[in-house]
């Protein structure tokens, strides 16, 4: 079971148009309806703000949006501390507050995170420069993270 972040959903929407890849979107809707695919309310808000037609499609598909609980907010703060971020001084090349909430949501629900943020093969010299996949790979965070294409390949689904 997976949680999508905004980058992956917008990537899918922009690169696999519904009219040209209807089988893919029927399958994604089925995954949503089976509750195998969800989104943090934070990521959903980002999708709706940036790509309203995709947001509308997700609502129509019945997407379950996972709320940010006190436990999730506290875990996001813990991760923020691991990154050495003080106050609102997030590094422009690293994760932001919403990203931490999305990671903490996936962690709280024991879900794999699907993110299309850039992979960093070598962790940056400054932890606050880490992107979502790199933060997820930290031992103290330990959230499995894959990108959209890996998600599709691993599913074994065939779209005709």
Report each predicted region and the residues it spans.
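Active-site neighborhoods of divalent-metal-dependent phosphate/nucleic-acid chemistry enzymes
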Residues: 70-134
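Short His-Asn-centered micro-motif
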Residues: 4-6, 40-41, 95, 115-117
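Residue-level detector of structured alpha->beta connecting loops
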Residues: 36, 62, 107-110, 140
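Short, well-structured N-terminal submotif of metal-dependent ribonuclease cores
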Residues: 1-39, 45-60
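Domain-start "cap" segments at the beginnings of catalytic or binding domains
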Residues: 37-40, 45-86, 148-150, 158-159
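A generic structural signal for well-ordered alpha-helical segments
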Residues: 32, 58, 105-106, 136
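Acidic, PIN/NYN-like endoribonuclease modules and their adjacent C-terminal/linker elements
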Residues: 1, 13, 21, 119-160
